[in-house]
Amino acid sequence: MVEYWTLDRFEIGRLLGRGKFGQVWLAREREKGFIVALKIIPIKEIQTVETARQIRREIEIHSNLKHPNILRMYGHFHDKDNIYLILEYAGKGEFFKFLSDRGGKFGEKETSLYIRQVMLALTYMKECNVIHRDIKPENLLLGSDNQLKIADFGWAVYNADKRRMTFCGTMEYLAPEMVNNDIHDSGIDLWCLGILTYEFLMGKTPFESKNRNMREAYKKINSLKYTIPETISSNASDFISRLLVLSPGDRMELTEALNHPFIVKHHGRSSD
């Protein structure tokens, strides 16, 4: 039976955050009382055909993904003014804030815990033929049970086996193939995984430039110019260096990464 949603079925609470195309509000479904995050996208802000296509694609992809480390989309509806996305409520909120409150970085055990959860989600997404293309702390949430949740599928695409040329992502996380406007595939998420691991451990991204100078950042990316301090273990260093590889085909695959010593030391081998 198809569930039909309308806004009057929800009691709207406090503002949780603002995104590129709208706001996210805490909400309670009146009949059953369950708590959700309601993303409200004003239709007037969808000003191009490409934006409309991107939002439709985001809804299609996100609503079909069901994994403990991916924020659930329970449904969606619209009226004359807005599009509404009914999302899982992540009780501990924005992962970026959680990271900032911890001084901007984690120790190796905690880093490996959260990176493993990202990898489990990416493994599932690969099975579903999905590339996220914008993995970064700002697109992660944290559930009440400390489960990391990948959110914001605005740049996600189907057909991970096809090679694409759309330029997307965040400057500090851009893979070499994106910087050089080359075709790209699911290898882009492996690069982002390496950047994320580095940032969790170091409190900054590896290819940062002064005043966010794009040309300087791109030069560093293409030359793999970054440093790892000696205080970082050889396992962690090796894990990062095997993901931050210029050629996408030479990056460590997720199955190998899940069983890398950096992960196994703290969490055991994975059968995923």
UniProtKB/Swiss-Prot annotation:
It is found in: Nucleus; Cytoplasm, Cytoskeleton, Spindle; Chromosome, Centromere, Kinetochore. GO terms for molecular function: ATP binding; protein serine kinase activity; protein serine/threonine kinase activity. ATP binds at L16, G17, R18, G19, K20, F21, G22, Q23, V24, K39. Its main location: nucleus. Its EC number is 2.7.11.1. GO terms for biological process: chromosome segregation. Pfam families: Pkinase. SUPFAM superfamilies: Protein kinase-like (PK-like). It catalyses: L-seryl-[protein] + ATP = O-phospho-L-seryl-[protein] + ADP + H(+); L-threonyl-[protein] + ATP = O-phospho-L-threonyl-[protein] + ADP + H(+). One of its GO terms (cellular component) is spindle. Residues 10-263 form the Protein kinase domain. The active site is at D134. Disulfide bonds: none annotated. Keywords: ATP-binding, Cell cycle, Centromere, Chromosome, Chromosome partition, Cytoplasm, Cytoskeleton, Kinase, Kinetochore, Nucleotide-binding, Nucleus, Serine/threonine-protein kinase, Transferase. InterPro entries: Aur-like (IPR030616), Kinase-like_dom_sf (IPR011009), Prot_kinase_dom (IPR000719), Protein_kinase_ATP_BS (IPR017441), Ser/Thr_kinase_AS (IPR008271). Belongs to the protein kinase superfamily. Ser/Thr protein kinase family. Aurora subfamily. Component of the chromosomal passenger complex (CPC), a complex that acts as a key regulator of chromosome segregation and cytokinesis. Has a role in error-correction of aberrent kinetochore-microtubule attachments to ensure that sister kinetochores become bioriented and connect to opposite poles by promoting spindle assembly checkpoint signaling. This is Aurora kinase.
